[in-house]
C-alpha cells in the first residue's frame, strides 16, 4: 500500500490571494503534507467569489513553507494556456522548490475558457481529452531539456527549449471522474486525482481498477502512482454550523453537464442557489464527531486512495485547521 498522505485544499474560489497564502502556511503547521489549489479564471460564484492566479499563489506559499508539497488540482493546460508555457512555469517552480511541486491537470470547464476568448462551440469530451494527452506529451518532452520540434494536432513548437528544469522533470497528476481518463492516469500519470462523495461503486469498482488496468497495460507499478482524492468534509463540533457551512459550495452539487457547460459565474450561482441545503450537503462528509468523520474518511483508504486532500467549505478556515490538528489528524494517521 502506498504511503498515507494528508493534504489541504486551498479554495481559490472562496478566498483572496493573501488570505489563501496564510491558510496554506497554517495548514503545514496543522500537520498537512501537501496543499493543492484550483486554477480558475472565474469562480463558481459571482457574489463573494475569488479567483487568484494559482501559479503566483504556489510560488508565494513555496517561499513561506519548508516541506509542504504544492500542486494544482486542477489546471487545464490546453485552452487559455499554451502547454509549453505551463511546462516552463512548473519547471521554474520545480527548481525553486525541489521535490515539492506537481502539476495536476484536467480536461477543462467552459466557465474558465470561454471568458478568455475560446471561439466556437465548447468541445466535447473526446477533443478535450485528446488535447490533454497531447499537452502532457509535449510538456514531458520539454522537461527533458532538449530542443523540441513538436508537430501535434493541437500544439506545435519549433526548436523550443526550457533551460531551467529540475532533475526528473515535474510529476503530472491526472484528474479523472470516470474510468476512461482513470485508465490514462494509470498508463501515463505520476498521480491520479478524483473527488469524494459519489459512492463506493465509482471508486472501488471503476476508478481504482481502471488506474490499475492502465498501469498494467504500460507495464508500470500501480502502487507507485499517488492516488489522490479531494475529500469534501465539513467538520465542526457544532453540528448546525457543520451543515450550514456547505452552502457556499452548492455549485459542486450541480450535474457534471452543468458544471462543464455553464460559462458565466452569475448563471452558475443562480443554478446552485436553487438547490436545497440537503442536496448540497450530500456531496460532503458532514460531521461533528471526530470518530464518525474519520470512519467515513477511512472508507476511501479501504477503496484504494492514499493521498487524502481535505476541502473544508466554511469561511472560518482557521477554525477548521485548529479542529483538524486537534481532533482529526491524530486519528487519520492511524489509518495507515
UniProtKB/Swiss-Prot annotation:
Substrate binds at residues 195, 198, 259, 283. One of its GO terms (biological process) is carbohydrate metabolic process. Optimum pHs are 5.5 and 8.0. The active site is at 40 (proton donor), 109 (proton acceptor). Pfam families: Bac_luciferase. It catalyses: oxidized coenzyme F420-(gamma-L-Glu)(n) + D-glucose 6-phosphate + H(+) = 6-phospho-D-glucono-1,5-lactone + reduced coenzyme F420-(gamma-L-Glu)(n). Keywords: Carbohydrate metabolism, Oxidoreductase. Coenzyme F420-(gamma-Glu)n binds at residues 39, 76, 107-108, 112, 177-178, 180-181. Homodimer. Catalyzes the coenzyme F420-dependent oxidation of glucose 6-phosphate (G6P) to 6-phosphogluconolactone. Appears to have a role in resistance to oxidative stress, via its consumption of G6P that serves as a source of reducing power to combat oxidative stress in mycobacteria. Cannot use NAD, NADP, FAD or FMN instead of coenzyme F420 as an electron acceptor. Exhibits nearly no activity with D-mannose-6-phosphate or D-fructose-6-phosphate as substrate. This is F420-dependent glucose-6-phosphate dehydrogenase.
